[in-house]
């Protein structure tokens, strides 16, 4: 293990430790577990107030529902040739490259186009996938840029891809690096940007948005029932001193959330941190734009798999997938009109879940919801009334 301090981490040391009353309800601030560790009980020690990150090749990343993803996508990737020759897999959220590595290893003829908004993740994945360098194209881009990424890679934006994978949410690499500011269990700058080049940070939101905007973000993106109370206290607190670290926010949440609520329903900071992260990274609107583009990119008989880890994302996926598999024949007609059949069919009944064995190996998989579709019809086969 190794760790070199940055200026932001030096700030984290300076504000460490959190006050003991806060630690009473935020005990993980002393030890920082990785939610993708194989050992559910493993914890990363704090040295000088900074979590030490294991520099292993996979950075602790354990691909979620890997076998199920392979089972669902492989038929589309091997329909031309058993080794994947002629097939293209689009990984819209590459991360550490765990899912992509498996497909590339299993299918020596497969080509991969992979996107990630985080340049650090791309570099990690580039190293991990180096032995497949002649078959991969890595693109620094948010996943709502699928059409542009395909065009830049020499493919059409529509009907050119055989398989698509989305593994949504924040990655373990981002959670495990204190300077990124994603985790409420460690003191760090209030950043939360998945792309460090993006202009908006969590501190910007906390220090500049008005009370109504803050309450709306906490309620809409975090489903936080104490959103108004928290927003009011944020505004009062920043009038005295701006928010700079996650410890500042954790301390405020300890004061704002009633004691009974702090003791039940999971970590009391979870909803606020989720809301800020979603707002900083525009995650939900990005997903709303990305999924239609992904469906357009699929060739006939191509397949898409989406892994979502929180209900707001899963609702978007569920709604858009339901629209994709619906007939376009007017509901008052008794028969299906030619050319109005659904363009997609569902490959899962509801949302797929991890089993107990996988959850024990990989605790992050407990939250996952998997949904998958197959394209059955090309857009140009539809009627004029579409």
From Swiss-Prot:
Q: From the Swiss-Prot or TrEMBL record, state where the protein is found.
A: Cytoplasm
> What biological-process GO terms show up in the record?
rRNA base methylation
Q: What intrachain disulfides are recorded? A: none
Answer whether the UniProt record assigns the keyword rRNA processing to this protein: yes
- Alphabetical keyword list: Cytoplasm, Methyltransferase, rRNA processing, S-adenosyl-L-methionine, Transferase
Family, per entry: Belongs to the methyltransferase superfamily. RsmH family.
Matching PANTHER family? 12S RRNA N4-METHYLCYTIDINE METHYLTRANSFERASE, S-ADENOSYL-METHYLTRANSFERASE MRAW
Protein name as it appears in the record? Ribosomal RNA small subunit methyltransferase H
Native species: Mycolicibacterium paratuberculosis (strain ATCC BAA-968 / K-10)
Q: Could you read off the lineage of the organism from its UniProt record?
A: Bacteria, Bacillati, Actinomycetota, Actinomycetes, Mycobacteriales
């Amino acid at each position: 293990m190794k760790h070199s301090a940055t200026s932001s981490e030096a700030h984290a040391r300076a504000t460490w430790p959190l006050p003991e009353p806060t630690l009473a309800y935020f005990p993980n601030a002393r030890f920082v577990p990785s939610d993708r560790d194989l050992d559910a009980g493993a914890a990363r020690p704090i040295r000088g107030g900074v979590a030490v990150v294991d520099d292993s090749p996979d950075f602790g990343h354990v691909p979620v529902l890997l076998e199920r993803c392979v089972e669902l996508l492989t038929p589309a990737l091997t329909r031309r040739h058993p080794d994947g020759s002629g097939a293209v897999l689009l990984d819209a959220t590459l991360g550490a490259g765990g899912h992509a590595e498996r497909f590339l290893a299993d299918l020596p003829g497969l080509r991969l186009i992979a996107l990630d908004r985080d340049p650090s993740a791309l570099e990690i994945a580039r190293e991990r996938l180096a032995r497949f360098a002649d078959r991969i194209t890595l693109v620094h881009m948010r996943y709502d840029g699928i059409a542009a990424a395909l065009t830049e890679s020499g493919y059409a934006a529509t009907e050119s891809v055989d398989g698509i994978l989305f593994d949504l949410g924040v990655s373990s690499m981002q959670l495990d690096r204190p300077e990124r500011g994603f985790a409420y269990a460690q003191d760090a700058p209030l950043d939360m940007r998945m792309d460090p080049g993006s202009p908006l940070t969590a501190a910007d939101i906390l220090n500049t948005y008005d009370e109504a905007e803050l309450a709306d973000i906490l309620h809409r993106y975090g489903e936080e029932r104490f959103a108004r109370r928290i927003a009011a206290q944020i505004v009062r607190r920043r009038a005295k001193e701006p928010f700079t670290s996650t410890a500042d926010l954790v301390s405020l949440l300890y004061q704002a959330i009633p004691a009974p609520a702090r003791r039940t329903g999971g970590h009391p900071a979870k909803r606020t941190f989720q809301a800020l992260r979603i707002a900083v990274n525009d995650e939900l609107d990005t997903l709303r734009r990305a999924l239609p583009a992904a469906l357009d990119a699929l060739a006939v008989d191509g397949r898409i798999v989406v892994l979502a880890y929180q209900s707001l994302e899963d609702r978007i996926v569920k709604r858009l997938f339901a629209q994709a598999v619906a007939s376009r024949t007017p509901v008052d007609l008794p028969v299906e009109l030619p050319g109005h059949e659904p363009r997609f069919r569902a490959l899962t009944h509801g949302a797929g879940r991890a089993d107990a064995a996988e959850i024990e190996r990989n605790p992050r998989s407990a939250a996952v919801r998997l949904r998958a579709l197959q394209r059955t019809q090309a857009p140009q086969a539809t009627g004029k009334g579409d």
